[in-house]
Regions:
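Conserved active-site segments centered on acidic
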Residues: 1-81, 89-93, 102
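Phosphate-binding/catalytic loops
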Residues: 96-142
Length: 142
């Protein structure tokens, strides 16, 4: 069972889709699925031209960039997520209001970066070993 990550911003046409596509690229060899959503999108809208340019510069395939369509943050979109990365505290608040069970799984990007900086490789290895071979269980243990 893959690890389910969601990135969240306002319109789902710049920050969260860039984060989604870049995480997919970086984590392509791992059992991870990444999606994105917006708190106030125009459903179906494409990424902005500037966001598309940045994505291309990051090495994201054109087909993936062009396939993006903005979608609204909702309970079904949040269902089963192991990690939610919000662009701002307001976005994180919107996530937790929709699904309070995500309180300990939803972070702003900055919060997640600060927290992950303090976890050592040894701690990750120990947590992973205790969780067995299931990638999702290993991720949750970490």
């Amino acid at each position: 069972m893959p690890i389910e990550i969601l990135t969240v911003c306002t319109g789902n046409i710049v920050r969260s889709p860039l984060s989604e596509l870049y995480l997919r690229l970086l984590l392509a060899d791992l059992p991870v699925e990444v999606a994105s959503a917006g708190t106030q999108p125009r459903p179906g809208e494409a990424m902005t031209e500037h966001a598309c340019e940045i994505a291309a510069e990051l090495g994201i395939p054109a087909a993936e960039i062009e396939a993006h369509q903005a979608k609204r943050l909702s309970e079904p979109v949040l269902a089963g997520r192991d990690l939610v990365l919000a662009m701002t505290r307001a976005h994180r608040k919107a996530v937790v209001e929709l699904d309070p069970s995500l309180l300990r799984k939803a972070f702003t990007i900055l919060e997640f970066a600060r927290l992950s900086r303090h976890v050592t490789d040894a701690e990750l290895h120990e947590a992973g070993a205790d969780a067995g071979d299931n990638p999702r269980a290993r991720f949750q243990a970490a």
